[in-house]
Amino acid sequence: MVKAIEIIDLHVTLGREASRVHVLNGINLTINAGEAVGLVGASGSGKSTLLMVMAGLEQAEKGQVLVAGEDFTAMNEDSLARFRGKHIGIVFQSFHLIPTMTALENVAVPLELAHHPDPFGRAEQELNAVGLSHRLNHFPAELSGGEQQRVALARAMAPDPTLLFADEPTGNLDEANGLAIVDLLFALRRERQTTLVLVTHDSELAARCDRTIRLRSGHIEA
């Protein structure tokens, strides 16, 4: 099996001096290409921090983080930003859409940054794929929560990433919209063979993944 992510003896500490907290302690983990993995655990267990490290948004204090064969811990900020733009898509609980941009413009932003030859054409394709062809020119404030998360998903998938990270993607949605987003997320992932790492408190959602990893107090439970 091809390894999408390999983590070796990962340690992460947050805070300063007396208030420092050991969030992750000696994590060892391998995720294979095309696999869907759910990260579960109580609040404060370290699952979101682990996702952020794998996505290149949080630094490791110690250890190695190999993503698509590249060592995040050896990259400078510019190299890491380029790598994220090419290989990684992220969907958060909060939609993080730019309020002054339309749905189409929001999805086109990462494509423009990556110098895609047709960012708006590609963005329109992705919005069509998530069922928002009729909302291209609407601003976030004109969209429902479910529609905003669809825009966020389209934005994450537009660069055709090899890895998709989702941190509580249904946390701000009602049950019906949450289920629709999950169905769409898994359908797109399956269609494109994208590696998925999903943080969730929902055991039913985690069960849809190929494998579930439980964290407790910064450790992976055996």
Predicted regions span which residues?
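C-terminal segments of enzyme domains that contribute to small-molecule binding surfaces
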Residues: 190, 221-222
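ABC family nucleotide-binding domain
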Residues: 4-5, 10-208, 212-215
